[in-house]
Each structure stands twice: as C-alpha cells, then as structure tokens.
C-alpha cells in the first residue's frame, strides 16, 4: 500500500488536468507543471528521508512522511489558484518521498541478493497496479464530482495506510547509536562507482518513463484526439506491459543475476526507442496503433530495470540501505522532473519532443553505467 502512494498521487489526476486548468483559469501547460513539481518535491523528500530513516528507524520516518503528505493534499483540496496548487503539490511530494523511501529499505533489512531482487519485483507489481488503476479511479471520480474529490481520495488513502502501518509495521531498523551525518552517508554512496552505475541506470530509465507520462496526455488526447474516457485505458496498457515484464523478471532471477537482467532491459529500451524515433521521423502521419505498441514495449522494459538496479545498489550498503534507496529515488525523480519539463517546454503539438527525450534517456543510461563500472567489482551476494 505504501509503494502505491506516489503512483496514485502522480497518475490519478491526469484525466482531470483539462478540468483543473479550466476551473483554476489557467492553461493546461501550467497545470501539467504540477506533475514536474511533484517529481522534484518527491526527490527532495527522499534526500532527507533516507538518512532520517537510517538513523531514527523506519516507523518514525514513515509516520512523519505520511503526515506531511496529508497536509499537502489538504492544501490542494482548498486551493483557489494554480500557484497554491504548485506550493501544496511540492509539500505533498516531500512527504511522499520521506514515507515511500522506507518500503525498499525494509525489504533490504530483511533480505539480500536474489531474494531482495525478487521481493523488490513483487513490490514493483503493486507499484504498477497503482498507475494502471489510478487514471481509471481519477476518471470515475471526475465523472461523479470534480477534480478536488480526486485529492480527497488521496487524503483518505494516506490517512488509511498511515493508520495501518502504525498498527502493523514492525521496526526493522533500530535507532542508530552512532552519529553519522547525512552528508557522510551520501558521500559513502556517491563515492562508490559501481553503485553509481546502477543508480544512473535507473535514473535515466525513470527520466524516459516520466517523459512519456508527462507527454502522453497531449499526445493521446491532443495529437491523436483521444477522449478523456479512452485515455486511461491506453495509459493502462503500458502498465500491463510493465507488469508482465516484471513477472518475467521474477522467473528469470532463478537463472540469471540481476545485473544481466538490468542490461537486458536497457538494451530493450534503446532498441524500442530507436525504432519509435525512426518511425515518428519518417511517417507523415504516425499511426496510433503502432505508436501504442512501441510505447508499451518501451515502458515494459522498466520491469527489468528498476528492481534489478535497486537490489544491485543496496547490496553495497547494508547499514545505509534507506540512504542508498533515497539517492536512487531522488536522482531518478529529479531527472524525471527535468525530462518532463523539457517535454512541456519543447511541446509543439506532435509526439516528436516526447520521443526524442525518451530515446536520449534510454541511450545515456547504459553509456553512463559502462563508464562508471569499467574495471569495478560487481555485488558479491547475488549468487545467494
């Protein structure tokens, strides 16, 4: 439930963006900025939430983060202009970042190696169900009432999981007795070149995915003139593809190391984004079905990338797993905020800006990983 918090906060309101823009007397572009602001705020929350969790424990960090998330959500519900939405969206995101970073950290507290990768893959299935259902939930709520009720739903969800975790989440990380500063914890992770290779692999993969998430409303509902009712179903096809790839990843982990499967996912993203870029460049009028298929294949590759990059990274830092997870998330979501903003800034009413940025992200990820990891040792626990 905790891992679904951010996918719900990101995707549930996507069908409501045109209505929000009209209600707040602003443009769709300005309303879409709230998505990039959430990604940036989420990154900030993870930066501080990781070391906080490693020092004070998982329960304290989770409770604090969910409280901040609910305060920000309440502010959005009563906002009367887009600038207020931007402000409270950042507050909401910071709380989400502080809370969600604990999910992967708890898994690392209790497992490692291939076991950790399998547990993270199972967690990813839950994460993927959320963006599949979120636009549908948003669409239903939108037809019942208006966009504000979507954020009421998020508030109730945050309060519910906060109560459940308070009653049922055991403490898997005792309060640290040593005084290790946040900067020392991050310096430890940032000085590890092999770990950085995995971190930036996930970073650029997330950047490519958020370029799609940000650009998909204008591409599907604008360029291809798809209705608000059909859009969530097209969006959901990508999530189904990612879930299937994730289930495949769980099976393949019985035979292959996470690092190999990560490379396989990166290669798939490069290939599909290259085909997508070539098609958009050469086709006079791109066909919707072909575009949807290629986008599904690109997003599905995330099922092989995220959990394997995460498990490979945290293997190096058993005592600072939340800090490592926070760095993974914060850099990835910051890159997602940047790529999403670029899609918005370069938007020309065609799929071109979205597709170019997706290809660039897919290509840069494995290149940076290769440069950082050349001659470096890999994790040693993945045979277990």
Where are these regions (language model features)?
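Juxtamembrane intracellular "pre-TM" segments in multi-pass secondary transporters
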Residues: 170-199
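A late C-terminal transmembrane helix in Major Facilitator Superfamily
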Residues: 311-349, 358
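Conserved MFS/SLC helix-loop-helix module at the cytosolic interface between two early adjacent transmembrane helices
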Residues: 44-82
């Amino acid at each position: 439930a905790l891992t679904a918090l951010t996918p719900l906060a990101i995707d549930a309101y996507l069908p409501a963006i045109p209505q929000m823009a009209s209600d707040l007397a602003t443009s769709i572009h300005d309303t879409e900025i709230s998505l990039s602001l959430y990604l940036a705020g989420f990154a900030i929350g993870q930066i501080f939430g990781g070391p906080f969790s490693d020092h004070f424990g998982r329960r304290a960090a989770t409770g604090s983060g969910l409280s901040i998330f609910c305060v920000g959500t309440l502010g959005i519900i009563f906002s009367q202009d887009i600038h207020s939405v931007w402000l409270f969206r950042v507050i909401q995101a910071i709380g989400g970042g502080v809370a969600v970073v604990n999910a992967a950290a708890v898994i690392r507290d209790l497992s490692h190696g291939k076991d950790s990768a399998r547990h993270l893959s199972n967690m990813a299935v839950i994460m993927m169900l959320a963006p599949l259902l979120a636009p549908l939930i948003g669409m239903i709520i939108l037809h019942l009432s208006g966009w504000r009720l979507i954020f009421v739903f998020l508030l109730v969800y945050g309060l519910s999981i906060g109560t459940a975790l308070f009653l049922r989440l055991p403490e898997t990380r005792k309060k640290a007795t040593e005084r290790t500063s946040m900067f020392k914890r991050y310096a430890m992770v940032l000085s590890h070149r092999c770990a950085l290779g995995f971190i930036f692999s996930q970073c650029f993969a997330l950047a490519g995915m958020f370029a799609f998430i940000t650009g998909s409303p204008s591409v599907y509902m604008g360029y291809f003139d798809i209705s608000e009712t059909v859009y969530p179903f097209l969006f959901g096809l990508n999530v189904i593809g990612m879930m299937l790839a994730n289930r495949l990843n769980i099976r393949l982990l019985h035979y292959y190391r996470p690092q190999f499967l990560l490379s396989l996912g990166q290669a798939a993203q490069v290939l599909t984004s290259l085909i997508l870029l070539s098609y958009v460049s050469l086709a006079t009028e791109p066909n919707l079905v072909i575009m949807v298929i290629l986008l599904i294949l690109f997003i599905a590759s995330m099922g092989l990338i995220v959990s394997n990059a995460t498990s490979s990274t945290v293997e190096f830092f058993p005592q600072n797993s939340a800090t490592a997870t926070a760095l993974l998330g914060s850099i990835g979501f910051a890159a997602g905020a940047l790529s999403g903003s670029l899609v918005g800034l370069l938007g020309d009413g065609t799929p071109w800006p979205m597709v170019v940025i997706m290809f660039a992200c897919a290509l840069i990820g494995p290149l940076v990983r290769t440069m950082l990891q050349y001659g470096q040792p890999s994790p040693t626990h993945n045979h277990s």
